[in-house]
Amino acid sequence: MKRYRASWLYTGEGSPQENAMIDIEHGRILGISFDTNDAIDLGEVAIVPGLINAHTHLEFSAITSPLEPLTNFPAWIRSVIRWRQESEFGIEASILSGLDESRLSGVTSIAEIATKDWRNSLQIQESRSLPSKTLMFREYLGLSDEAAQSQLVDAEKFLQANCDAG
């Protein structure tokens, strides 16, 4: 077991606690105490519960500056799609970059809006960057009859796989 001390501990219940210790074993919090014996002092920091990012588009994590604002939403969406088609940064690398950024920012749960179900990608599985809770919403782009038909088949497979998985 390890004991960590922080200037502030916020559990989500009540006011933040000053100079609190948390006891952790095998990655799980066992309890909170105020006994400073053998505590690893984290300094002037706050410990907070894991954060939730309720709207992510991780495949666009490689965009380093905002895309040009355009006069209307459809034109802006076209610029996003064009960026993705022209980007030299691969989608999986962009997703991994976004997952790493999330993890380093204290995010433990995400709700991802994705054009492709990337959760079973070997590269992403091996990275171990996937948050403990990941909810995925599929986004389908393209209005042609041909695109709609293939997307409908893909959506049915996605729904069935996720219903079967619980």
Predicted features and spans:
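Short acidic/polar active-site loop segments enriched in Thr and Asp
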Residues: 108-109
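Active-site gating loops and adjacent loop-to-helix segments of metal-dependent hydrolytic enzymes
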Residues: 61-93, 135-138, 166
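Histidine-centered catalytic micro-motifs
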Residues: 49-61
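Histidine-rich, glycine-flanked metal-binding segment
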Residues: 1-3, 8-48
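Short beta->alpha connector loops
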Residues: 113-118
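Metal-coordinating catalytic core of metallo-dependent amide/deamination hydrolases
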Residues: 119-166
